[in-house]
Swiss-Prot record:
Reaction catalysed by this enzyme: L-seryl-[protein] + ATP = 3-O-(5'-adenylyl)-L-seryl-[protein] + diphosphate; L-threonyl-[protein] + ATP = 3-O-(5'-adenylyl)-L-threonyl-[protein] + diphosphate; L-tyrosyl-[protein] + ATP = O-(5'-adenylyl)-L-tyrosyl-[protein] + diphosphate; L-histidyl-[protein] + UTP = N(tele)-(5'-uridylyl)-L-histidyl-[protein] + diphosphate
Pfam families assigned: SelO
Protein name: Protein nucleotidyltransferase YdiU
Active site per UniProt: D256 (proton acceptor)
Taxonomic lineage of the native organism: Bacteria, Bacillati, Cyanobacteriota, Cyanophyceae, Synechococcales
Length: 492
């Protein structure tokens, strides 16, 4: 009898599987003692042409907890530079590619699992995901989506009834399995593995596949390879700028954790800045601070340079150098534009020198003021008044802190004067647009570590999921929300 599960009747495409056995290994999903759907991302279903009202929790569990009705399930092969050291012993260690489906927008999407059991690349691990790890990924990806950052999403999170032991969580801890919704799971490290085995033919095959599938606007262009790398550079620079403006620290920017389409994924010990600290390091095991917040743009550029090694098997050095040459300018332009939006302005409204001066002054203030990074922008959103344009004295410091003695006077006055200066450069008719921009760019609450714990503790102690759902709903509806499609030029 044909399945009535809408996930099992989707028109799956064997895009990655068609590359052949050199790129992946067929695996079996783990079986779990229990299945309880804890999160379902109904906002993604219309992209697949599905009506959330017709998709039941049991449909999610059957497809994404029991993994029935799909084969082959593919553990993808890749290598990578981990903390600067090449590691050839990598691959999908606790997940697999469940399937690929073309959305109504024409884009191909991956369903990729996390916590679905052992694979040939588990390296002695159990292949499982803690429930807290799953909740953390939901929080990170949904908040970044709310900010307009390009990111993979969590489609479902199912608690699976096992006790897991971890060194970085109080144990035993609860288990889960997640299905991610990403544009692709092809990484920089997917190419690096092929270079390791000296397979220029497979580099060529994979590059053709990536261009045809994710950069199809370049098909037929005699300079498609060079333009692909230049565009990947732009996308990666944009992504780094988005993270920095968001105050987001990915924590583990190894080459196997960077997507070939410039999308955030592989969330591990991520963190959002509480206070602004350029040297903040999110991962407890990053003892040298290699992947600290301020290093993220440079690490992204370095990883693009490392990608030149496998791509250099089929591309000229001149094309690769030309492609990466614009990284710095692209990053700075995107970062400036995004920071100005968080301050309520559009870059094309302002003289660049004045705008850049405001950004620098803002960061100098945040270094010393007793206020959180995202908290500052949320309070600016709440306190901004159109009267600030005509009356400098109306811009009072008490919205930053009531402890005015703790506020560095020189930094505060410098910021206030520059913000007022930008307001006077705009016509009065633009003031309502500033308020709208502040609301769209600055959610009222960010998932800094205390907020994450305030959501997790009720789950851990009382199995109370209401605080998580309340926070997610707040992001969905706060400031008119963000679109569920990712707006990136040429992101086909």
């Amino acid at each position: 009898m044909p399945s009535t599960n809408p996930f099992l009747t989707l028109p799956y495409e064997p895009a990655f599987a068609s590359l052949g056995s050199e790129f992946s290994d067929p695996v079996e999903a783990a079986t779990f003692p229990a299945h309880q759907l804890r999160f379902r991302n109904d906002r993604l279903l219309p992209i697949l042409g599905l009506d959330p009202a017709t998709v039941t929790d049991e449909h999610f569990i059957e497809a994404f907890g029991r993994f029935q009705g799909r084969s082959p399930l593919l553990a993808m092969r890749y290598h990578g530079y981990q903390f600067g050291i090449y590691n050839p012993d990598l691959g999908d260690g606790r997940g697999f590619l469940y399937g690929q489906v073309r959305g109504r927008n024409g884009w191909l999407y991956d369903f990729g699992t996390k916590g679905s059991g052992r694979t040939p690349y588990s390296r002695g691990g159990d292949g499982k995901l803690t429930l807290k790890g799953g909740v953390r990924e939901v929080l990170a990806s949904e908040f970044l989506q709310r900010l307009g950052v390009r990111t993979g999403r969590c489609l479902s999170l199912i608690e699976t009834g096992e006790e897991l032991w971890r060194g970085d969580e109080p144990s035993p801890t609860r288990s889960s399995v997640m299905v991610r919704f990403n544009r692709t799971h092809i990484r920089f490290g997917t190419f690096e593995r092929l270079h390791y085995f000296k397979r220029a033919d497979l580099v060529r095959q994979l590059l053709d596949h990536v261009i045809a599938t994710y950069y199809s606007h370049l098909l037929g262009d005699p300079e498609a390879d060079a333009k692909f790398y230049a565009e990947l550079t732009e996308r990666t620079a944009d992504l780094a700028a988005q993270w920095m403006a968001a105050g987001f620290c990915h924590a583990v920017l190894n080459t196997d954790n960077l997507s070939i389409v410039g999308e955030s994924f592989d969330y591990g010990p991520w963190a959002f800045l509480d206070r602004f600290d350029p040297k903040f390091t999110a991962a407890y095991f990053d003892h040298s601070g290699r992947y600290r917040y301020e290093n993220q743009p440079g690490i992204c550029q370095l990883n693009l340079e490392l990608l030149q090694v496998p791509l250099g098997m089929v591309m000229s050095a001149a094309d690769l150098e030309a492609g990466i040459a614009g990284f710095g300018d692209r990053y700075q332009a995107t970062y400036s534009r995004l920071m100005l939006r968080r301050l309520g302005f559009e870059a094309d409204q302002l003289h660049s020198a004045i705008a850049d001066d405001l950004i620098i002054t803002t960061l100098q203030l945040l270094l010393r003021a007793p206020i959180g990074y995202n908290e500052f922008f949320a309070r600016l959103r709440a306190q901004f008044q159109p009267s600030w344009r005509s009356d400098l004295s109306a811009i009072l410091p008490d919205w930053i802190t009531t402890d005015l003695e703790a506020l560095p006077e020189a930094q505060w006055q410098g910021w206030r004067d520059r913000y007022h200066q930008l307001l006077t450069h705009l016509p009065e008719s633009q003031l309502p647009l500033i308020q709208q921009q502040l609301a769209q760019a600055n959610p009222e609450i960010a998932p800094i570590r205390p907020v994450v714990e305030s959501v997790w503790d009720p789950i851990a102690i009382d199995d109370n999921w209401e605080p998580l759902e309340a926070l997610l709903n707040r992001w969905r509806h706060d400031g008119d929300g963000a679109a569920d499609g990712v707006v990136v030029p040429n992101a086909n």
